[in-house]
Amino acid sequence: MDGVSNWPAPSTPTPVHATLTIPGSKSQTNRALVLAALATPQGTSTISGALRSRDTDLMIGALQTLGFDVESVGTDSDLRVGGGLAPAAGARVDCGLAGTVLRFLPPVAALSTETVEFDGDEQARARPIAPLLAGLQSLGVRIDGDGLPFRVRGEGSVAGGTVEIDASASSQFVSGLMLSGALFRDGLTIVHTGESVPSAPHVAMTVSMLRDAGVEVDDTETNRWTVRPGRVAARHWTIEPDLSNAVPFLSAGVVSGGAVRVTGWPAVSTQPAAAIMAILEKVGAVVRQSESYLEVQGTRQYQGFDVDLHDVGELTPAVAALAAVATPGAVSRLRGVAHLRGHETDRLAALSAEINGLGGQCEETADGLVITAAPLHGGVWHSYADHRMAMAGAIVGLRTPGVEIEDIATTAKTLPEFPQMWADMLAGQTATDPEAGA
C-alpha cells in the first residue's frame, strides 16, 4: 500500500511474562451507544469504559449525524448520550469499515423524518448488507439501493411486524434489526431462513443488553426473535474489556512459553470468554481464572488441534497464527468459518496467502483452513486493512524473526494502542490502556 511503512514485528527467544489491561469491548460499546441514542426520549444515558477506536468513533460520528449528542465526560472512555433523532437534510453517515455502523443504523435512520445516505470505505462496499436492507423494505421502509452507497428515506415511523431474513452471512443483520425493534409500532419478529447464524454469541449479547434496557425480547425459539413494542430505558452502561482483543496478548504467552495475565477479566460475560479459554487449552496452555484476572501459561511447543470457530469467527486469524507456529508437522483444522469470506477482507484467502508466503502450509477448505505447521521465514505479512490480520501477524512474528507487518496502523479499528502495548509487553512492562484508572 502506497505511503504505508512496514512495522518490524518483534520476535523473542525467551518467555513473555506480562500483565495487561485491555480497553473496552467494541461490540458492547457500539451496542450501548445505539441503545443510549434510542433511549433519549426517556433521558440521558452514560457509558463508562467505552472503547475509543476507529469503529467506535465512526459510531459516535454517525449518531451525531443523526442528531444525537454524544460527548466525553472527564475521559475519552466516559460518555454521555442525549439529544434526539433529528438528522439534517442531506445527512450522510460514514460507515468507514465498521460493520456495526453499516448494519445497526439503517433501522434507526428509518425512524427519522429525513433521507439519510450511507456510504463508507471502498472496501466496505463488498461487505454484505443486502439482506438487511431487503428486510427493512419488507417492513415498508423506503430504501434506494441494495449496497453501499444507499439512502434510507425516513417517514417518522416503522410499522414493524414479521420479517424473514437470511442472516447466514452476518449475525449483525439480526442484531441491527433487534436494537431498533422496540420502537417499531408493532414491535418486530425476526425469522432467520438460512443456514446457521454465525457468531451467535453476539446475538445473545444484543438480547441481553436489550433486556438490560427494559426491552422485552423472546428468543426461546431457535432462529426466531420477537421484540415487543415499548420504550428503551435510559441508564448507565459499564463496558467490559474487549476479550477478543486480549487473545493476541494471551497467545504471546502460549507461543513464547511464558505467562500473560489480563486484568479485569469478567467472571460472567456475554462475550465469548468460555470459547477463548477452551481454544487456548486446546494448544496445551494452562488457563487460570480468578475474580479479577485471566492468566495463560504456555508451553512454546504444542501439537495441532481441531476447532469449530463458527460462533467466534473473529478469533480465526489469531488461532490460525497459533496453528502456523505449532511444532513443525502438527496439523490443525479450523472449521465453521465460511462466513469470514465476507468480513473486512476474505480472511480465509488472506490467511492462506500470508502463512504460505512465509513458508508455511495452509489450505482453504469449504468452511475453514487446514494448517500444517512448518518452519517459517521472514517477509512481509500483509494486513489487508484488517485489524485482526495485523494482530495475527504480530503473533507469527514472535516466533519468526524478520516478519514485517504492512499497515500496523489498521489495528486502530479496535485497539489504537496495539503497537505500544505489544512493545511494552515484550519489554517486561505492565501494558495498560492509557485511560485505565483515569
UniProtKB/Swiss-Prot annotation:
Q: In which pathway does it act?
A: Metabolic intermediate biosynthesis; chorismate biosynthesis; chorismate from D-erythrose 4-phosphate and phosphoenolpyruvate: step 6/7
Q: What Pfam families does the record tag this protein with? A: EPSP_synthase
Which residues are named in the active-site annotation?
Answer: 314
Known InterPro entries for this protein? Enolpyruvate_Tfrase_dom, Enolpyruvate_Tfrase_sf, EPSP_synthase, EPSP_synthase_CS, RNA3'P_cycl/enolpyr_Trfase_a/b
The EC code for this enzyme is 2.5.1.19
The UniProt record gives the binding positions of phosphoenolpyruvate as 26, 99, 127, 172, 347, 388, 413
**Compartments it resides in:** Cytoplasm
Q: Name one GO molecular function term.
A: 3-phosphoshikimate 1-carboxyvinyltransferase activity
- Specify which residues bind 3-phosphoshikimate according to the UniProt entry for this protein: 26-27, 31, 170-172, 199, 314, 343
Main location class? cytoplasm
Q: Which GO terms describe its cellular component?
A: cytoplasm
The alphabetized list of GO BP terms reads:
amino acid biosynthetic process; aromatic amino acid family biosynthetic process; chorismate biosynthetic process
Keywords per UniProt: Amino-acid biosynthesis, Aromatic amino acid biosynthesis, Cytoplasm, Transferase
Q: Which reaction does it catalyse?
A: 3-phosphoshikimate + phosphoenolpyruvate = 5-O-(1-carboxyvinyl)-3-phosphoshikimate + phosphate
NCBIfam families on file: aroA
Q: Which family does it belong to?
A: Belongs to the EPSP synthase family.
Task performed by this protein: Catalyzes the transfer of the enolpyruvyl moiety of phosphoenolpyruvate (PEP) to the 5-hydroxyl of shikimate-3-phosphate (S3P) to produce enolpyruvyl shikimate-3-phosphate and inorganic phosphate.
What PANTHER family does this protein map onto?
A: AROM/DEHYDROQUINATE SYNTHASE (PTHR21090), PENTAFUNCTIONAL AROM POLYPEPTIDE (PTHR21090:SF5)
Question: What quaternary structure, including any partners, is listed in this protein's UniProt entry?
Answer: Monomer.
- Can you say what this protein is called? 3-phosphoshikimate 1-carboxyvinyltransferase
Species: Mycobacterium sp. (strain JLS)
From the broadest rank down, the organism's phylogenetic lineage runs: Bacteria, Bacillati, Actinomycetota, Actinomycetes, Mycobacteriales
Gene name tied to this protein:
aroA
